[in-house]
Amino acid sequence: MFNRPKGTRDFAPSEMKKRKIIENKLKSVFMAYNFNEINTPTFEYFELLSKKTGEDIRKQLFVFKDHGNREMGLRPEITSSVVRFYINELKNLPKPQKLFYFANCFRYEQPQAGRYREFWQMGCELLGSKNPIADAEVINLAMDGLNKINMDYEIHIGHLGVLKGVFEEFGLTEDEELKIRRLIDKEDYENLEKCLIELEENKNIIIKDIIFSVLNSKGTVEEVIGNLKEILKNYPKSIEALNNLEEIMEFVKRNNYIINLGIARGLDYYTGMVFEVYGKKEGARQVCGGGRYDNLIELFEGAPTPAVGFAYGFDRIMLNIDDFEVEDKRILIVPIKKDKKLLKECLIIADKLREMEKIVEVDLMNRKLNKALNYANTVGISKVIMIGEKELNERKISIKDMETGEQKLIDLEELSNI
């Protein structure tokens, strides 16, 4: 017997129906905002996948060589592929380009609840606009999607330009800034404090209290931005970032958000507004993240292009929504006598119903009627059509509602009413 690879899953039909319902609801929201769906390859050149984060990503990827000895990798996320696609094919089209995707991704990490080696992402990229309303649109879109599927969540919104403005004002070296960024990204505040104290002693500066004032800022727009504008009044780039965040929030249509300047996701990647969404089930796991990344397309050797986007962790979303029943409207057609004439009529009626977009199954097991009804009841089929010779001669069929037990004769012309 073969087992599936570690960190992967099989989805039974009942689970796939639920996943497909949630997928389609989320996609409908992207399309309502006029985002267009695209698809990209499951594997890319390793050079592309490592461009954003460097060689360190290798141990997290599934890397292999093709028959031409070229190094490839299974995609760990979709944005790099979208950027490549944009630079190669879409850069000359009218702006903004509004793209969305839904695809499986792969990371070689230790499997645990809500974390797999194969997982699904759904997300979007809005390319070509630096207008604050573009930032607000992707935040609104992310919230609208989760509201569409009735998920209980909490959204935190921040701006990396505030911290970056502090770094710039103190004239830190590249290595010093990188060390601080990594500690913030890991939320290793104990070692961050030690690092900042050491910097203060070596450079005769006061930076620790400023950094922690930013990281600990959480609350409403008025509370956070008003307070930080006073603390950072001598840091022009930080003030510029706070003004930008304030303008973005004017266009965010709901107020059930938390301004959180402690968000430090992807300090090497994002350039401005960032946000994270946490589900309120399953230990408040993050289910969505995104922000502005105006330097990424240039990093991939394209022309400088402003960009903003986000991705849902689809598997975590499925863990965070309440279980629901899938409405089952399948129909089973059963010939009462097992002869070819009746079976052919069953197939003709099945085709007519399928043309009406009904989900129809014809009994393929030559079951007796009572066993066919038992089968329908076991697998959750909603209606059974029974076709007998006498009824057929009268242009009638018998139909049984498996939920209510009601059975009636109807004219063949009434098929569309089933």
Curated annotation (Swiss-Prot):
Name of this chain's protein: Histidine--tRNA ligase
Gene Ontology molecular function: ATP binding; histidine-tRNA ligase activity
Compartments where located: Cytoplasm
Reactions it catalyzes: tRNA(His) + L-histidine + ATP = L-histidyl-tRNA(His) + AMP + diphosphate + H(+)
Keyword Magnesium belongs to the record: no
Gene3D superfamilies assigned to the protein according to its UniProt record, in alphabetical order: Anticodon-binding domain (3.40.50.800), Bira Bifunctional Protein, Domain 2 (3.30.930.10)
Keywords: Aminoacyl-tRNA synthetase, ATP-binding, Cytoplasm, Ligase, Nucleotide-binding, Protein biosynthesis
GO biological process, one term: L-histidine biosynthetic process
Keyword Nucleus part of the UniProt annotation: no
PROSITE patterns per record: AA_TRNA_LIGASE_II
Residues in the signal sequence: none
Coiled coil: none
Family: Belongs to the class-II aminoacyl-tRNA synthetase family.
EC number: 6.1.1.21
GO cellular component: cytoplasm
Top-level EC class as recorded in UniProt: ligase
InterPro entries: aa-tRNA-synth_II, aa-tRNA-synth_II/BPL/LPL, Anticodon-bd, Anticodon-bd_dom_sf, His-tRNA-ligase, HisRS-like_core, HisRS/HisZ, HisZ
